Amino acid sequence: MTVLTEKWADVLDLEGAPKIVDAHRRAVTAQLIENQVKAMKEDYAHGQFFTMLQEDAPVNHGGDGVAMGQAGTNAQMAGYDPVLINLVRRAMPQLIAFDVCGVQPMTMPTGLIFALRARYGKQDGQEALYNEADTGFGGDGFGQLGATHKGSNWADGGEYEVGSGMSTMDAETLGAGKDWGEMAMSIERTSVTAQTRALKAEYTMELAQDLKAVHGLDAENELSNILATEILSEINREIIRNIYITAEVGCESGTMEKGVFDLDVDADGRWSAEKYKGLLMRIEREANRIAQKTRRGRGNFIICSSDVASALQMAGMLDYAPALQNNLNVNEAQTTFAGILNGKYKVFVDPYQANGSANQYVVVGYKGSSAYDAGMFYCPYVPLQLVRAQDPNTFQPKIGFKTRYGIAFNPMVQVMAGVGTGSIKAKDIAGKNYYFRKFVIKNL
């Protein structure tokens, strides 16, 4: 348990809120609550908030939350805003970012993501420890790539040779007669800068009074929930769409058309269920391709339309209630998590794409167990900032929400795509992020 998770244990284990089981998700949520409180302290210190429309607290009371300062000192403003803390606690752990990309909270408005690359020769040489090792580089005494190691796939035919170690006589003349194989390393970095989303809402005091009297609802709380939900939904969609745009096109071979898997042409079966199993084999091939290109691991999650998820279920492969996983994070409100495919893929349904269409789709992606092992990173800074104000002419209340976060891509992906290591948009590496692969499904 980290210092922050221990500090905010009462909030993280809030009764009635979805339980946070994953240790990383707890740590990130704790850091975001800490960032939230820090931002609130600064806002209160600079007088950016008007009175919080709540009853006066007793003199020795530190507010509804944990006191920002000493109890009894400006008691009404000393407590953390329970609306914001509750929204952060309930909403942030539900973001799909935790399952499909790395989540690295920022403590400052700018940050850097680093990647170390091994090189053959000098720092600008060809990358090592990525594809197959050159069997002759350290053993033939030439100090060059491809001198004795040739060919990449023996099944394709053509020249295919292997390098070997050098003799004792040659080893004794290294540096004079024979050349040492030299290696180096370079450190790549990608910058990430916090960006902002902002929404506002206005209401009248008469509306607030009537809503309270008739329905027992607080107008400010209801509008706050609407604004916060919209902001977080927009972030979810931004993450999903970034994956769609940057994912590599799959179905490179074994299909009539690149990027398309036609169940009538590319799958053989007497019944639909047999063809659906052919679709599963295609998903397996795309996951294997991700492993070959990233050298990190096979694809382990899928984003698809609801029709594709139904097809996989009908094939008997999609388990909605895995016997060994009793704490699945199923967000029924957004209907995104569908289940576990073949015991190893998390399946997420995109409810807004391709439903009822003739062409369906699948995106296969990889996210490692570490927050640093992913093709894309979501970097929250200040989860939610609530601003209260009053119209100077009508004196009617207004509220505004802001959130600050950054989106960054794996620096290795950017370097391989040839776009540099600065802050980029998804369109700059469209179809080049090899941590994700996408293909269209026809005749489902």
Predicted regions: what they are:
Residues M1-G138:
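Extended assembly-interface regions of large multimeric machines
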Residues D81-P82, R89-A91, A97-D99, E161-G165, ...:
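Sequence/fold signature of self-assembling virion shell proteins
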Residues I239-A247, C251, P411:
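Structured alpha-helical bundle/scaffold domains in large eukaryotic membrane-trafficking regulators
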Residues G250-E274:
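Acidic/histidine-rich catalytic neighborhood
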Residues E6, L14, E34, E55, ...:
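Generic detector of low-complexity/intrinsically disordered segments
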Residues R90-P93, V103-M106, G111-A194:
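Assembly/oligomerization interface modules of large self-assembling protein complexes
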